[in-house]
């Protein structure tokens, strides 16, 4: 059975046992997380969501928090200025192993829902604003 999930603004086609590199999630290595934004579930029959499949989920285990490959941005300005600048960037990523694809029954699984770091910051900000 496979599923198409959405996280970090991207879509991934996964099945049990797959290892994924996704945008950084607010969790620690060894945590079990669940993705509820499932766009499609397939197997014997295919179910396409509008926009999400109700009750479907993908459960995964966090292997590690890693950094992506370094990208280097080099800027050289035009004549008579002799100015150069080099900037590097390494994207923060989360390494996951998919443990299970659930076509239904995701609400009763008891596994924590995966949230990105931006979602976690937004929730903390909203909680402090209410106090």
Curated annotation (Swiss-Prot):
Claim: Chaperone is one of the keywords in the record: no
Gene Ontology CC entries for this record: cytoplasm; ribonucleoprotein complex; ribosome
Record keywords, A-Z: Ribonucleoprotein, Ribosomal protein, RNA-binding, rRNA-binding
Pfam family, one: Ribosomal_L21p
SUPFAM superfamilies: L21p-like (SSF141091)
InterPro entries: bL21-like, bL21-like_sf, Ribosomal_bL21
Example of a GO MF term: rRNA binding
GO biological process: translation
Keyword set includes Ribonucleoprotein: yes
Highest taxon of source: Bacteria
Record family assignment: Belongs to the bacterial ribosomal protein bL21 family.
Role played: This protein binds to 23S rRNA in the presence of protein L20.
Record-linked NCBIfam families: L21
Quaternary structure (record): Part of the 50S ribosomal subunit. Contacts protein L20.
Full protein name: Large ribosomal subunit protein bL21
Organism: Cereibacter sphaeroides (strain ATCC 17023 / DSM 158 / JCM 6121 / CCUG 31486 / LMG 2827 / NBRC 12203 / NCIMB 8253 / ATH 2.4.1.)
């Amino acid at each position: 059975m496979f599923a198409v999930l959405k996280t970090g603004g991207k879509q991934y086609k996964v099945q049990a046992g797959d290892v994924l590199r996704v945008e950084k999630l607010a969790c620690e290595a060894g945590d079990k997380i669940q993705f509820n934004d499932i766009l499609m579930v397939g197997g014997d029959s295919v179910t396409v969501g509008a926009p999400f499949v109700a009750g479907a989920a993908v459960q995964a285990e966090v292997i590690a928090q890693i950094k992506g490959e370094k990208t280097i941005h080099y800027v050289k300005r035009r004549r008579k200025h002799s100015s150069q600048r080099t900037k590097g960037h390494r994207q923060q990523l989360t390494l996951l192993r998919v443990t299970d694809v659930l076509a239904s029954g995701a609400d009763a699984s008891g596994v924590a829902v995966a949230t990105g770091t931006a979602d976690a910051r937004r929730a903390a900000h909203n909680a402090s604003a209410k106090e």
